[in-house]
């Protein structure tokens, strides 16, 4: 059975047990909950006729489904050819012969002629501002609102509440405010100001008063007045210019707001009255329908579409409670200042939003066409677009894009022919909704091996709508393992970080982006910092991403965005990109194609046990939340109780790693099962405080989560590209049906 046949069988099983109430729309059978939302809430708001919409939607689905199937069959065909090659050429790989083979089968394609992308009408957050990017599950309205509002964040809070400030020398966090810790935060903030907006001849640490004189920032120390070294760094203020409430500064296109309030507890203890330093933080945010959510049916998908629609209308709200107080969270308004020339200056109060659709693989029961589930990527393209139309309306004061663009991230594409299919799909959606051509911008995730080695060709397939490329090391590692499953046993998971292909892959993404003209038109992005609690370490290490030429990189939280934003004040990314362009492109292809097989497999029994336990614990800790709680992205304690941000990409690596080691007899199926059972006890203990949690041990056969974990590992060589979605979706739907 091929990988695609395995997936089709699971899809058919799901469709066969369908009991969803449906409405006929354009010849499609649409789940009533989804139909009602789109027809009653969305279409009247965006001025689209319902009959025209549903019939046009059905035409797109019918026309493009065969091509979607062909592309998936092509994945299967290439994988079988590669598997056969490795079986017939075991041992040391002849790199030149291997590359010739990949060209012969069409895995490697000709590089396109020298040309640059032509994208127009992109917002400044993408074209000319370098800064952090959040990724947030769209099914959680609170998370979505917090992320959209994370455009601005308190540096003091981010420092005080994390390990960015050590809890030594009396600086413990504690339950009450600790002035010793607070002072260390203030000192850190002053050093930061000295680094990025220095005064000419003085330190911010010595300033006694800030105000505005002669249209410039004045920093008073005794009887002396000091100005900024770079006078252009001052942008504006609020309040009275002699006693301002806020002062706006800027470096590298990012803003810093000094908030002054001598009555505030923090401001009262500061000689300048400075109560906080607020940083422009999450410049862009991806609202995610993919790896960070568990959306398996019409109810789940409709919730996501509804939240996305509310973000675009500006009307999404969520009632919350904190410390016994109930309040309503809603989207922040824009920020208004008096500019340095005395006129009003308005800055965006919210993060610019992308939406991540699913890839080309999965089908979803929300809509049936001729009795078969619709390809979810086609459904997402149509429905996330129609829900985004209010976000480009000029009359909407809370609109998302000032340039009239809708930004869609398309993940898990294998090579330029699949990117071309996305371009065709987006064009059809624009025609359906009477949107100007190339209104839909695309973010191409460089997270599958066939895209990495054909990145230039993939970019040029969407040359008129490309808004970003981004490395996704986690998924990319999963595909690295699965593609070369038959080549031999892979190095340990931690050693993938230093394997030759990895750095070459990261370099190639930046180099291709620069050579194809992305700077000034599109983002070149890098991946996630997953260790949510280790912010000191993030401050130390993640600055490497802007230094490598990435003008955005992923962060796991608004707090992480604020701290990572400091890096973009310290590094002028666009200058780095100019230097990289001048240096010329690095020759990366040979290294990208260097398969990370282990030179030998003589690990000790303890090392093998450690690798099994780490992966089994990671898999179980994530899968149990996914299958039984519907949580697609969560902080999961690892085997050492360090919280890691886990999503399906991390699951893909761990399951493929173990599948590979079983395949090559590094470990046995029985050893892995024994590790799974021991780690289930560990995960049960880690979740002991959750009343809704169901133990996996000792009744493993009754736990759908445990069974899903087993499937992911033991069926890992058969799962399409090593993807986890088919198994997760099937088990989640089974759990929902039984509960």
UniProtKB/Swiss-Prot annotation:
Pathway: Carbohydrate metabolism; glyoxylate cycle; (S)-malate from isocitrate: step 2/2. The keyword Lipid metabolism does not apply. Its main location: cytoplasm. It is found in: Cytoplasm. Mg(2+) binds at residues 447, 475. GO terms for molecular function: magnesium ion binding; malate synthase activity. Disruption phenotype: Cells lacking this gene show the absence of malate synthase activity and to the inability to grow on acetate. Optimum pH is 7.6. It catalyses: glyoxylate + acetyl-CoA + H2O = (S)-malate + CoA + H(+). Gene3D superfamilies: Malate synthase, domain 3, Malate synthase, domain III. Inhibited by oxalate, glycolate and ATP. Residues 1-18 have a biased composition (Polar residues). Mg(2+). Co(2+) or Mn(2+) could partially replace magnesium. Residues 1-23 are annotated as: Disordered. GO terms for cellular component: cytosol. It is an enzyme of class 2 (transferase). Keywords: Cytoplasm, Glyoxylate bypass, Magnesium, Metal-binding, Oxidation, Transferase, Tricarboxylic acid cycle. The keyword Flavoprotein does not apply. GO terms for biological process: glyoxylate catabolic process; glyoxylate cycle; tricarboxylic acid cycle. Acetyl-CoA binds at residues 135, 142-143, 292, 329, 556. Belongs to the malate synthase family. GlcB subfamily. HAMAP family: Malate_synth_G. This is Malate synthase G.
């Amino acid at each position: 059975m091929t990988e695609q046949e395995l997936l089709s069988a699971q899809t058919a099983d799901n469709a066969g047990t369908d009991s969803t109430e449906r409405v006929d729309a354009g010849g499609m059978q649409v789940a009533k909950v989804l139909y009602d939302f789109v027809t009653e809430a969305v279409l009247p708001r965006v001025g689209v006729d319902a009959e025209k919409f549903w019939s046009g939607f059905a035409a797109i689905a019918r026309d493009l489904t065969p091509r979607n199937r062909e592309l998936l069959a092509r994945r299967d065909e290439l994988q079988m050819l590669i598997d056969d090659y490795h079986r017939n050429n075991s041992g040391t790989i002849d790199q030149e012969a291997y590359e010739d083979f990949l060209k012969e089968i069409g895995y490697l394609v000709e590089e396109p002629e020298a040309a640059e992308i032509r994208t127009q009408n992109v917002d400044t957050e993408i074209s000319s501002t370098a800064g952090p990017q959040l990724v947030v599950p769209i099914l959680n309205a609170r998370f979505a609102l917090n992320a959209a509002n994370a455009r601005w964040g308190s540096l003091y809070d981010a420092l005080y509440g994390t390990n960015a400030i050590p809890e030594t020398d009396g600086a413990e966090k504690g339950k009450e405010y600790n002035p010793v810790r607070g002072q260390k935060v203030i000192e850190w903030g002053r050093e930061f100001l000295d680094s990025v907006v220095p005064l000419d001849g003085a330190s911010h640490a010595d300033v006694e008063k800030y105000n505005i004189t002669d249209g410039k920032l004045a920093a008073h120390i005794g009887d002396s007045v000091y100005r900024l070294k770079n006078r252009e760094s001052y942008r504006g203020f609020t309040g009275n210019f002699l006693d301002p409430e806020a002062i706006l500064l800027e470096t590298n296109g990012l803003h810093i707001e000094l908030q002054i309030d001598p009555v505030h507890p923090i401001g009262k203890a500061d000689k300048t009255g400075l109560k906080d330093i607020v940083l422009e933080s999450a410049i862009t945010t991806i609202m995610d329908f993919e790896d960070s959510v568990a959306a398996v049916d019409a109810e789940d998908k409709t919730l996501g579409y509804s939240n996305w629609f509310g973000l675009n209308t500006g009307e999404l709200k969520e009632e919350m409670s904190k410390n016994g107080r109930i309040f309503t969270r809603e989207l922040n308004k824009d920020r208004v200042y008096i500019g340095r020339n005395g006129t009003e200056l308005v800055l965006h109060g919210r993060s610019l939003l992308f939406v991540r659709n699913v890839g080309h693989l999965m089908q979803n029961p929300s809509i049936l066409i001729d009795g078969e589930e619709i390809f979810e990527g086609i459904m997402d393209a149509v429905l996330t677009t129609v829900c985004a139309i209010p976000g480009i309306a000029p009359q909407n004061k809370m609109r998302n894009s000032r340039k009239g663009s809708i930004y869609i991230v398309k993940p898990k594409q294998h090579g330029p022919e699949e990117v071309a299919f996305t371009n065709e799909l987006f064009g059809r959606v624009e025609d359906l909704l009477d949107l100007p051509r190339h209104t839909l911008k695309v973010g191409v995730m460089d997270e599958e091996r066939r895209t990495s080695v054909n990145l230039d060709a993939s970019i040029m397939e969407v040359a008129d709508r490309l808004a970003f490329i981004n490395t996704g090391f986690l998924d990319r590692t999963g595909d690295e393992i699965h593609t070369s499953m038959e080549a031999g046993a892979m190095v340990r998971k931690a050693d993938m970080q230093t394997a030759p292909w990895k750095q070459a892959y990261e370099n190639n993404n930046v180099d291709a982006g620069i050579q194809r003209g992305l700077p000034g038109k599109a983002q070149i992005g890098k991946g996630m910092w997953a260790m949510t609690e280790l912010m000191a370490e993030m401050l130390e290490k993640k600055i490497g991403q802007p230094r490598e030429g990435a003008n955005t990189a992923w962060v796991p939280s608004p707090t992480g965005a604020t701290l990572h934003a400091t890096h973009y004040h310290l590094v002028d990314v666009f200058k780095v990109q100019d230097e990289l362009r001048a240096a010329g492109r690095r020759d990366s292809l040979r290294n990208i194609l260097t398969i990370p097989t282990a030179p030998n497999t003589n690990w000790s029994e303890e090392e093998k046990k450690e690798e099994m336990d780490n992966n089994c614990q990671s898999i179980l800790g994530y899968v149990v939340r996914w299958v039984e709680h519907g949580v697609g992205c969560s902080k999961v304690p690892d085997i050492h109780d360090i919280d890691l941000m886990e999503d399906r990409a991390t699951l893909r690596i761990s399951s493929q790693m173990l599948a590979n080691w079983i395949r090559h007899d590094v470990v046995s199926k029985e050893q892995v099962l024994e590790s799974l059972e021991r780690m289930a006890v560990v995960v049960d203990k880690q979740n002991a405080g959750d009343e809704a949690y169901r133990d996996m041990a000792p009744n493993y056969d009754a736990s759908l989560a445990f069974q899903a974990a087993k499937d992911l590992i033991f069926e890992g060589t058969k799962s399409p590209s090593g993807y986890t979605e088919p198994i997760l979706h099937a088990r989640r739907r089974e759990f929902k049906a039984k509960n």
